[in-house]
UniProtKB/Swiss-Prot annotation:
Role played: Involved in oxygen transport from the lung to the various peripheral tissues.
Name used for this protein in its record: Hemoglobin subunit beta
Organism the protein comes from: Leptonychotes weddellii
Sequence positions bearing N6-acetyllysine: K59, K82, K144
Residues reported to bind heme b: H63, H92
Modification Phosphothreonine, positions: T12
PROSITE patterns (UniProt xref): GLOBIN
Globin domain boundaries: 2-146
Gene designation per UniProt: HBB
S-nitrosocysteine: residues bearing it: C93
GO biological processes: hydrogen peroxide catabolic process
Keyword NADP: no
Length: 146
């Protein structure tokens, strides 16, 4: 991902304030609510029968945290996202058969959740930088697909 020094600084500064547990669960939960067809990848997560069930599901929250911890790794390696996400790309492609379009959807949901959490601090410039990052991460995760 090609970010200016200013964009990198904005992304890093905001990310330092992110509560990964809370934001991860909320982002994944919202993905499952807004795009219900993504639920098929989470059969083992138990009750996903309603928005309330999804948003309060401990497995959704735990996996959301895991996703954002991986995203944090990506932020530390913006110059090598494909390398950083190579194993996860392989797993999601070869074993889990996740549609790579879902990575873009989750990235966009994450941007919305960050905007919701940070309000005025999430300026248009910060949003633009995060859109570049989530697009880069989605691209890296889709890399192993043929």
């Amino acid at each position: 991902v090609h970010l200016t020094a200013e964009e990198k600084s904005a992304v890093t500064a905001l990310w330092g304030k992110v509560n990964v547990d809370e934001v991860g669960g909320e982002a994944l939960g919202r993905l499952l609510v807004v795009y219900p067809w993504t639920q098929r990848f989470f059969d083992s997560f138990g009750d996903l029968s309603s928005p309330n069930a999804i948003m309060s599901n401990p497995k959704v929250k735990a996996h959301g945290k895991k996703v954002l911890n991986s995203f944090s790794d990506g932020l530390k390696n913006l110059d090598n996202l494909k390398g950083t996400f190579a194993k996860l790309s392989e797993l999601h492609c070869d074993q889990l058969h996740v549609d790579p379009e879902n990575f873009k959807l989750l990235g966009n949901v994450l941007v919305c959740v960050l905007a919701h959490h940070f309000g005025k601090e999430f300026t248009p410039q910060v949003q633009a930088a995060y859109q570049k990052v989530v697009a880069g991460v989605a691209n890296a995760l889709a890399h192993k697909y043929h």
